[in-house]
């Protein structure tokens, strides 16, 4: 409203993210992502592992404590960060094991979406804790044609995962006029 816009669509963030991932998988045409993609939302507000299997989302919440949010925001203490990573990865590992046991499919890579500034630092710790799983930030713009006036701004961003919700909403096939 402050920007002079009237919202028309209210959506659930994880489904907008699913839409962005589906679109990315379609554009990049990677056979390994065709019917099994794991996406981790790692942030201050939302934390969950979403496994997209045969176009169905399987979502597992990842819980973090209030003090863990403070650690994510501004802690420089390596021991605090290690504790947070240990608690977090334990939950991610359990969600992966539950899926792999039920569906007999292996998860090798996880696309990460995050609003955390030092995401690469945390991904390095995740990789050390779960050796058989790759963690990479999700780039929802991969495969998209970006207008030249925006390309330079986009190129300056190491982590483009923050655009996932916006890209996902743009690709949602919703009939807003009913």
Task: Please name every model-derived segment.
Residues 1-178:
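Hydrophobic/aromatic-enriched cytosolic interaction surfaces used to assemble or bind macromolecules
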